[in-house]
Amino acid sequence: MILVNVHAGNCDNTLKNFKKKLQRELYFRKMKEQRYYETPSAKRVRKAQEAARRIRKFARKKMYEE
């Protein structure tokens, strides 16, 4: 459960903090994934693609650091 404190009726900052906390907990991604049923084989393919993307991103970062 996500708790957000409201200080002096400041709704704008409260809403901003709430959205930030939802993003940190990957809430929006989970909602998007659960919107439709994903077959186990499609899930494996997606996970492998995400892992490959992370590896390429890390390699690119490493290349620019050197």
From Swiss-Prot:
Record carries keyword Ribosomal protein: yes
Question: Which GO BP terms, alphabetically?
Answer: translation
Any matching Pfam family: Ribosomal_S21
Supply the alphabetized keyword list: Ribonucleoprotein, Ribosomal protein
GO CC terms of this entry:
ribonucleoprotein complex; ribosome
Q: Which family does it belong to?
A: Belongs to the bacterial ribosomal protein bS21 family.
Matching InterPro entries: Ribosomal_bS21 (IPR001911), Ribosomal_bS21_sf (IPR038380)
Q: What is this protein called?
A: Small ribosomal subunit protein bS21
MF terms from GO for this chain are: structural constituent of ribosome
Its lineage reads:
Bacteria, Pseudomonadati, Pseudomonadota, Alphaproteobacteria, Rickettsiales
The record's section on HAMAP family has: Ribosomal_bS21
* Disulphide bridges: none
Name the gene for this chain: rpsU
